[in-house]
């Protein structure tokens, strides 16, 4: 009975997310995504691999050392 209730709640959550526009990945991938929290914005940037308007540091080939130090900093802050 516990699993039936859990499955029901989970299906309601999935229906709510899909009604809002298709899930977390589409929320992160749409260009209008701009969260209120600065940390959430930076985390989404890190997950997506850089900013949208220009190439990321690893793609442009410059500042390679700074890119890795930034990611280590974010990993340390996230844990």
UniProtKB/Swiss-Prot annotation:
Range of residues in the leader sequence:
1-19
Tissues with expression: Nacreous layer of shell (at protein level). Expressed primarily in the mantle with highest level in the mantle pallium and lower level in the mantle edge.
| Stretches for region Disordered | 52-71
Q: Where in the cell is it found?
A: Secreted
The GO cellular component terms are:
extracellular region
| Keyword tags | Secreted, Signal
In this chain, composition skew of type Polar residues spans 58-71
Tell me the protein's name: Uncharacterized shell protein 8
Protein species of origin: Margaritifera margaritifera
């Amino acid at each position: 009975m516990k699993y039936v209730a859990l499955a029901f709640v989970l299906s309601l959550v999935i229906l709510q997310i899909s009604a809002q526009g298709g899930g977390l990945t589409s929320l992160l991938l749409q260009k209008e995504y701009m969260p209120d929290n600065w940390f959430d914005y930076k985390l989404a940037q890190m997950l997506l691999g850089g900013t949208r308007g220009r190439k990321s540091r690893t793609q442009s080939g410059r500042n390679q050392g700074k890119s890795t130090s930034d990611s280590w900093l974010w990993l340390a802050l996230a844990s």
